[in-house]
């Protein structure tokens, strides 16, 4: 019999963004540095809202262990010594783009769609389901994405292991192993009823699809200069 965790993983992996054509090109060194930076700019806009979703859920969840995890995760992301958004910006600057252009850059339609979906998720769905979509459908993907990109950054883009410019990707391999494990544990603990489990699996699947579509927008913009899907 398939376990609840196995069903969650399967729902995520049907549209795991690590398999997206954009990341396939990056892993093979077939994107320019500027094209990789364009992903990071959109990721900046996505992550900025993801942090707000976590803060909102922390205000809604009644369980201390879940609140603690959310605040720990937020603390890691917003560490004043080296914010993760600043790590992203440093990579963009290393690709010869301007630091001030990151926050003020255009938000692609696909990125905005993911942002808006996330707010509907946290406002309208039970907190257990929202966290399943966030922790498993979205956040847990990034570990495998970074495992795919880091070797390429070393081999094809000239960054030495441990280089400050790519610390966002390297550090997420360790951090997301910890976060991913705790995220799964929370969802398994608080989605004990069959109905909640079914909702959680569907939410994870939906989150993965939403992230894939967001990647589609980045692909068309980075490779073809298209800001939306106008024919």
Residue ranges and their predicted role:
Residues 1-231:
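Non-heme di-metal
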